[in-house]
């Protein structure tokens, strides 16, 4: 039987690829465009772009506003986009990404989603040099002390997160009272929101440095859906001595980039974050 050629040898239909440049330009701009501007964005002459737009319009991938002549994405493009979003499983899409991160960074990567009791691990990719941290599928991260918990707290509604934080705060206060020390007490929700959560939003990452397990640090990045809601967190975990936890470090940049790419695949645009 004849084997299929590798991707780089497969022949395509060039006219479809050229038309795709116009669709890419419309999707990137996110608004209807005049022919001249659309052609320039796609890197082609206006006359050539017009011919392709006529064909794309006939199949519903673009449509022209008769009142101003601008071109936008058509009903078929909308239908395809909605179907793509319905088929996009965040956990499935993120699994190979987290495995690649574990190999590239040399650290364990956890995937957490928001569950009934808070951020819950649903996938783990062990590092090549595994660290001994008691984590497994179903482990629930705290809101106050973990990178994943702080991340979800920064982006979810207060009504979802605050009750869990207050429960942790009461538990910490009780432990501190029994030990005769105030060292384990947590700040008020207002203080937590104005300091930690504000920083998490500004940096685009959650971070913990030895607060849960001594000598272990973590960075966590959010993956958003098309509504701007955090559907999961990618969290890199490793020994504090080896994990670069700087906001501007190479690991932070790599993690942000991976999470942003996943968010884009789920239909998220940076301007979609709720106020």
Predicted segment positions?
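Cysteine/selenocysteine-centered motifs that mediate thiol-based redox chemistry or coordinate metal-sulfur cofactors
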Residues: 163-180, 256-275
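Short glycine-/small-residue motifs
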Residues: 61, 121, 232-233
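Amphipathic alpha-helical effector-binding/dimerization core
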Residues: 67-170, 174
């Amino acid at each position: 039987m004849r084997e299929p050629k590798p991707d780089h040898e497969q022949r395509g239909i060039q006219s479809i690829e050229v038309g795709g440049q116009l669709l890419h330009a419309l999707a990137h701009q996110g608004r209807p465009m005049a022919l001249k501007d659309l052609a320039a964005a796609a890197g082609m002459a206006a006359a050539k772009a017009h011919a392709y737009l006529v064909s794309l319009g006939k199949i519903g991938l673009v449509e022209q506003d008769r009142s101003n002549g601008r071109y936008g994405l058509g009903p078929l493009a909308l239908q395809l986009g909605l179907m793509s979003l319905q088929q996009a499983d965040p956990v499935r899409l993120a699994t190979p990404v987290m495995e690649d991160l574990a190999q590239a960074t040399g650290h364990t990567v956890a995937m957490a989603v928001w569950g009934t009791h808070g951020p819950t691990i649903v996938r783990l990719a062990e590092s090549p040099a595994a660290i001994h941290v008691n984590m497994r599928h179903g482990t629930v991260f705290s809101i106050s002390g973990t990178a994943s918990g702080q991340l979800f707290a920064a982006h979810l509604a207060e009504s979802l997160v605050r009750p869990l934080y207050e429960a942790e705060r009461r538990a910490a206060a009780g432990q501190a009272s029994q030990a005769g020390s105030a060292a384990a007490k947590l700040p008020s929700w207002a203080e937590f929101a104005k300091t930690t959560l504000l920083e998490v939003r500004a940096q685009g990452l959650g971070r913990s440095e030895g607060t849960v397990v001594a000598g272990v640090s973590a960075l966590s990045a959010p993956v958003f859906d098309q509504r701007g809601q955090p559907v999961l967190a990618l969290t890199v975990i490793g020994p504090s001595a080896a994990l670069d936890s700087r906001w501007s470090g190479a690991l932070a940049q790599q993690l942000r980039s991976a999470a942003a790419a996943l968010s884009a695949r789920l239909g998220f645009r940076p301007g979609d974050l709720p106020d």
